[in-house]
Amino acid sequence: MHRYRSHTCGALRPSDVGSTVRLSGWCHRVRDHGGVLFIDLRDHYGLTQCVVDADSPAFRAAEAVRSEWVIRIDGRVRQRPAGTENPDLPTGAVEVYIADLEVLGHAVELPMPVFGDLDYPEETRLRYRFLDLRREKLHANIMKRGAIIDSLRRRMREGGFFEFQTPILTASSPEGARDFLVPSRLHPGKFYALPQAPQQFKQLTMIAGFDRYFQIAPCFRDEDARADRSPGEFYQLDIEMSFVTQEDVFQAVEPVLRGVFEEFADGWRVTQSFPRIPYAEAMLKYGVDKPDLRNPLLIVDVTEEFSAEAVTFNAFKNLIRAGGVVRAIPAPGAASQPRSFFDKLNDWARSEGAPGLGYIVFEEEGGQLIGRGPIAKFVPAEVQAAIAGKAGLKAGDAVFFSAGTEAKAAGLAGKARIRIGDDLGLSDKDQFAFCWITDFPMYEWNEDEKRIDFSHNPFSMPNYDHKAFLALDPADADTILGIKAFQYDIVCNGIELSSGAIRNHRPDVMEKAFAIAGYGRDVLEQKFGGMLNALRMGAPPHGGIAPGVDRIVMLLCHEPNIREVVLFPMNQRAEDLMMGAPSEVTAKQLRELHIRLNLPEKSA
């Protein structure tokens, strides 16, 4: 028999009854039932109930065992007594009567238990992450993560993609988030950077003549943590393709993501054909460029209706005269809600920095749709009817309003849409609702600097005739601000999984694109000369995307925080409490790197 085990703790079944087995694992729990000890033995694969009584030579040793000790037991498999089976365990029909027990590893009193759903402070969980990972749910999340990555790899290979590995030590990027810098011992005063993404390398791979690239790529950015973003490092499914249109990228990526989500959906529905939503439409209908389509509510613009001469609600009319807009958020069935429902929404809007949410409640009176509420008296019946018609409202429904600059009105309306949908129970949560956001503006007006600037990705291809683009007058702001880019986001349940683009592979178009935004050729050469040089040597049309692996896993594990799907995450301050990183280094190490510290003075 093997030194430590003949079976794992999740393997035994009724067919093993009568067998002599050896198991090793952690003592999950010990229960003393008056001279009979029950030890739940746990390993990576599962849990088995083991039993020992005073008739066994192992009883004395078993009495000393405590939680989380690591032990080996030999014993015989037997059927559990009728009525004591545990249907929630794969091994729940059997138990092992212990004949021999060996302690392989003792455990001191633990700073946190490893069973149950008790929530412990983040600092404790991260400092003792190896204990936290023994907890069933977190352990399962990490295993699911590995299975998801395996599935992604398999599906990419089936789609004709080849896996590459790009450098981890590279040059610092002049754009984007802050780099993590690595000093060079051989080149004093110079630094490598950890890649924020393999963006330039994957494009260079296409220029090198490869066709379909992918990589489960580690990425490093010195930025603050969020619920859906780890500080420091994360992984993405990095993808690039040659000789493709935007639609080709969609057709390659959709089956991969749809297939992975269907494989791990646990019964949730998955969007079969991802809708394409133009950016402007998303901002109007959902108030955000990453809409949660599980919520059926659609925002509508009612600026024209509130501009009517007969409307006397001056708070909105004054905003409209100043260039603002009014957005309406429907609330189906909300007329039956108590006054507190409306008051809470108004209080919430004030907490968001808005003066409140005006609203109208619709009722039927004499066959007519009649509006009630604090602003209804300022809005004539014909305008109320027009608003109701545009928003698809009927008697028993309500509508809320958000007004201000287009950005502020859209932002508040988008948040209100989610809140109202949740409060009214309208959102269908048991699904993964995907969409593509397309047609991002190439440029935007920088109000602070009074000039045109890039709106999103400066390296994407303009969705504009190239000859006409090269001939554009930089002073023709109206035309330029109307240009769209071949940029796209993929969104699931209101979470942006990735941005992507068809790349600008033509140096002349790239130079013109930067010139329109006020960047001279010298700036372009200085910051991006290496990439420009490669583009001048025969670059194919190419494009790609990079869905975030951590966010995919977070969604499929139904976790609200990305920390719950990362093996050894940092805390919110980018500290590894378990390993003590970041840490000070020795003076000798600093001398070898020709580095002298100039630390800020500590405040008194």
Swiss-Prot record:
It holds the Pfam family GAD. Disulfide bonds: none annotated. ATP binds at residues 221-223, 496, 548-551. One of its GO terms (molecular function) is nucleic acid binding. The record marks 33, 83 as: Important for tRNA non-discrimination. L-aspartate binds at residues 175, 221, 456, 503. It catalyses: tRNA(Asx) + L-aspartate + ATP = L-aspartyl-tRNA(Asx) + AMP + diphosphate. Residues 199-202 are annotated as: Aspartate. It is an enzyme of class 6 (ligase). One of its GO terms (cellular component) is cytoplasm. GO terms for biological process: aspartyl-tRNA aminoacylation. Aspartyl-tRNA synthetase with relaxed tRNA specificity since it is able to aspartylate not only its cognate tRNA(Asp) but also tRNA(Asn). Reaction proceeds in two steps: L-aspartate is first activated by ATP to form Asp-AMP and then transferred to the acceptor end of tRNA(Asp/Asn). Homodimer. Belongs to the class-II aminoacyl-tRNA synthetase family. Type 1 subfamily. This is Aspartate--tRNA(Asp/Asn) ligase.
